């Protein structure tokens, strides 16, 4: 939400998301550009998000520019559960997966806890499928070393314009948009569902709401 992405836009994103009927909804940060008193009406429709296994989020760098702690409390009241260096287990039919999340790297500049992957994975079980929410894609290699199966990230806006993505790539270890393999880890970098106030243009790099389907390993009898 921002002056360019008002309540009506958020409402449309929420409606489109609900149409997908996903088991879980996750948001990988940079949800707002503005202070709570100015933007609350815009983000209020996020409270309509529903999913069988919950709605989860992590902070992006932009949340810290406008008071991340207050924003996190506001989002929590709307039903978004923030995984700030924490995890959550989803169990079904005798199996489970572990959803972990880390804070953004800029947090320490604001006197708050920076990303702590070890803490986020602390309650995961050996051999358990782990999905990591990390706003920035650049540390996918570290996540792979720690046994994460899937990392979901954003931050890059997909490069915003075809060609510009080549300039964005070096600062993000080459991860800009779409699906990548980093060792045994699958990394998906979303273009984001909106635009950035600082450069409100897209050309060849569309915004997106991504539906990801997970498949279990075949059972060998």
Regions found by a protein language model. Give the residues of each.
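Soluble catalytic domains of enzymes that build or remodel membrane lipids, polysaccharides, and related
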Residues: 1-221
